Amino acid sequence: MRPRPGGATVVLVHGASVTADLWRVHTRHLTGLGLTVVRYDQRAHGHTPCGQAPLTIRQLADDLHQILTSIVPAGPLVLAGHSLGALVLQELAALHPQHQARVRGMVLLSATACGASVLPGRSPRALLLAAGRSLFALTCTHAPRAVDLLRHRLPTTHPYSLAPRPDRPADGPPPCRHGIRHTHTRDLADLWQCLRRYQPRDATVLNQFGDRLLLMAGADDRHIPAAHTKQLAAQLPAVRLEIFPRTTHALPIRHPELISARIARLAAEPGPHPPHPQDRSFPNSLPSGQFH
């Protein structure tokens, strides 16, 4: 991979329990516009083993720092991360500020200033969902080998199977849980414990990006509620915030063209960033420049 002279390199960071395939469609859109794209499987995901280092957000940020240093040592960058990937980018900004001057734009999808929680709200449905998540996390933490044995016995078409799906389509957005199918239960448990214990850094470190930072979230996200993204935006006076109605945590999967357009816009030559025009995917919403 050789970045084009003078052009921005887009670096895409996926979330927990998925793989770099999350960005497959985005990559096609962005490279079609002449942009160089770097996407990779994070530690303990897809084709990247867990390794010997403890699985922490800090370690994942250090991994990304090494990737930037070795693969994209010079030239402008646009960084985009979803969910866990957004946390990794926040950690990168705090731990490795030397990259800041090169960052032409940053897109954080389903970002939060809070630690991880199984509780997405206070409604009866949210409480029931939280109970199920807690039971799943407890089982994975204390009996990972037993869970792996069970997953090996599941039909290959089951979303939690530990075998790769044979009839995976070559085009289109990948299902959300394809990453889980390639991730052992012990790694899933370690990742959850890492997220549960994580204490977010002072969010004001992101102020250095000014209006080059864009936060996006789905109004119906049950994993990282949009309220968490709004809380983060409230700490960043210059940030741009978009909350999309009728959209879940799968925002980048369901609307790859929209996300690609936002990234490409930031990858253009630096300058003032006016509000985005209304997107046709959301004809009944307010103009998508609902910036904080």
Regions found by a protein language model. Give the residues of each.
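Short beta-strand/loop motif that positions the catalytic acidic residue
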Residues: 209, 215-217, 221
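Flexible "cap/lid" loop of the alpha/beta hydrolase fold
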Residues: 98-146
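Conserved alpha/beta-hydrolase catalytic His-Asp/Glu region
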Residues: 143-207
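Catalytic active-site module of serine/aspartate enzymes centered on a nucleophile-bearing elbow/loop
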Residues: 237-292
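The conserved beta1-alpha1 loop
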Residues: 13-15, 82, 217-218
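Active-site loop/oxyanion-hole signature of alpha/beta-hydrolase fold enzymes
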Residues: 36, 42-87, 91-101, 113, ...
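Conserved HGGG/HGGXW glycine-rich cap/lid loop of the alpha/beta-hydrolase fold
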Residues: 2-49
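Conserved alpha/beta-hydrolase "acid-adjacent" motif
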Residues: 222-228
